[in-house]
């Protein structure tokens, strides 16, 4: 008998999700951007999925960008926002996923690291200290980005995202790959500006993820293509 106990790494595809997907690779495979009925059927399915995902986190459908997974979502949120908005400082923690840490290092902004306590928690005091240290450098900057993981896949720590996001007025991104589908998330109530997720972490297919982005926050970076709002 096979016993699998690493659902923090990946999960089994849910049979209902599998059945819902089945028609599209072989039967209803039209290009969603096409103008004819075959494509429009695929478009309806795509937008239904977008609406379902949006409802799960209390977002609007047009705020959901489908991606290939958490790594792409994290890189897109961090690297493209820092460039588009001329971000000077990115504030993060030392226990983030490598796709966050390396994206921060390659964002062109200065990286400020918030220490965690013995439980892996980013405390409000330590966060506020880094956010405003030195005050004349960080807090006077109109444009800086915070990226803190919502739930850690190795030690299970759930960060106080709502409280952290309410500090300082910075744009707030969270890597919620380990959280979506497992704990309640309300991006409006929690003050989240951008959120990354990956379907295979909550019984969805591999190679599929999404990025939630508050309206007007990110600029298109795929020029010449119409899929996913050019994002």
Residue ranges of model-derived segments:
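Pyridoxal 5′-phosphate
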Residues: 1-231
């Amino acid at each position: 008998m096979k016993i699998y106990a690493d659902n923090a790494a990946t999960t089994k595809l849910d049979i209902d999700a599998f059945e819902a997907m089945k028609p599209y690779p072989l039967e209803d495979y039209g290009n969603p951007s096409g103008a004819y009925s075959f494509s429009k059927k695929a478009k309806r399915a795509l937008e239904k999925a977008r609406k379902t995902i949006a409802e799960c986190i209390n977002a609007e459908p047009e705020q959901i960008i489908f991606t290939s997974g958490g790594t792409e979502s994290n890189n897109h949120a961090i690297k493209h926002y820092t460039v588009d908005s001329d971000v000077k400082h990115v504030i993060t923690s030392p226990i983030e996923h490598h796709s966050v840490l390396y994206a921060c290092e390659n964002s062109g902004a200065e990286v400020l690291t918030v220490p965690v306590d013995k439980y892996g928690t980013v405390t409000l005091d330590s966060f506020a200290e880094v956010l405003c240290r030195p005050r004349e450098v960080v807090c006077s900057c109109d444009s800086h980005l915070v990226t803190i993981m919502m739930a850690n896949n190795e030690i299970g720590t759930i960060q106080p995202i709502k409280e952290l996001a309410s500090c300082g007025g910075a744009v707030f991104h969270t890597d919620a790959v380990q959280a979506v589908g497992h704990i309640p998330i309300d991006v409006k109530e929690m003050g989240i500006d951008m959120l990354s997720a990956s379907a295979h972490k909550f019984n969805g297919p591999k190679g599929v993820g999404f990025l939630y982005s508050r309206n007007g926050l990110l600029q298109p970076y795929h020029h010449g293509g119409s899929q996913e709002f050019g994002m």
